[in-house]
Each structure stands twice: as structure tokens, then as C-alpha cells.
Design a protein with these regions (language model features):
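Short, compact, well-ordered microdomains
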Residues: 80-121
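N-terminal domain-onset segments
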Residues: 1-79, 113-121
């Protein structure tokens, strides 16, 4: 069931798109290509809604929908990552479309959605 992103979710995703490091920084050859790719993602932000939440019960991770539709696993997946004191935040992007926001806790800690200022890039 799709729902609108909260303002905190939207800000977190925007910060991840803008500043998070790619797990494979060699995916694109130039800084300009990366900047254009990030700009395309930011322009898509208004079309993103929240889908299914993770069922682990310890994290606020959730599926991202574009135009209220699930994003299919792509041939070209880029993972943007940032750290928080309690864990790791990852934004999965499949074929240029954000597909999942993962907030992975350290050990057995239960996490709430982190504030964008908590991100360590």
C-alpha cells in the first residue's frame, strides 16, 4: 500500500541523493556524470512514495515506489551509503530509479528514522 513520504523521509532521501557515497565509485567515469545522475534522482523525488516496510521489527527501512509502482531490480544497481552512530543508511538505485531505503542498525538495536543531520558521509 503506497503512502506519501513524510517530510523527514523526503529530507533523508534527498540528503542521501545529494551527498552519500556510492559503494562503487567507479560506476561512472567523471564527476560531471555523477552530478547529472544525482540531479536526475532529485528531480524524481516528487514522484516517490513509500511502499512496504521491512518486517524485521528493528528498522524503519522501506520500499520506494515511483508513480505508486514498485521499482524492478535493475541490471545496473548503485548503492549510496552513509553512516549514523547506530548503523548504516543505504539508498538502492536500480537502473537510475530509487528502489529501497535501508536503515540497518548495529547489532540488535532498534532504530527510528534518523534525522538527515545524523548522516555521516
Amino acid at each position: 500500500m503506497a503512502r506519501s513520504l513524510t517530510e523527514a523521509e523526503r529530507q533523508l532521501i534527498s540528503a542521501m541523493i545529494t551527498s552519500a557515497k556510492a559503494t562503487n565509485p567507479n560506476q561512472y567515469d567523471t564527476q560531471e556524470t555523477w552530478q547529472n545522475w544525482r540531479q536526475d534522482l532529485l528531480q524524481m523525488l516528487d514522484r516517490i512514495t513509500a511502499g512496504d516496510a521491512c518486517e524485521c521489527g528493528k528498522c524503519p527501512s522501506f520500499q520506494l515506489l515511483v508513480d505508486n509502482k514498485p521499482v524492478q531490480a535493475g541490471k545496473n544497481q548503485i548503492i549510496l551509503e552513509a553512516f549514523i552512530s547506530e548503523g548504516l543508511v543505504m539508498l538502492f538505485v536500480d537502473d537510475g530509479i530509487p528502489s529501497y531505503l535501508e536503515i540497518a542498525p548495529n547489532l540488535d538495536v532498534q532504530l527510528d528514522l534518523p534525522d538527515e543531520e545524523a548522516l555521516i558521509f
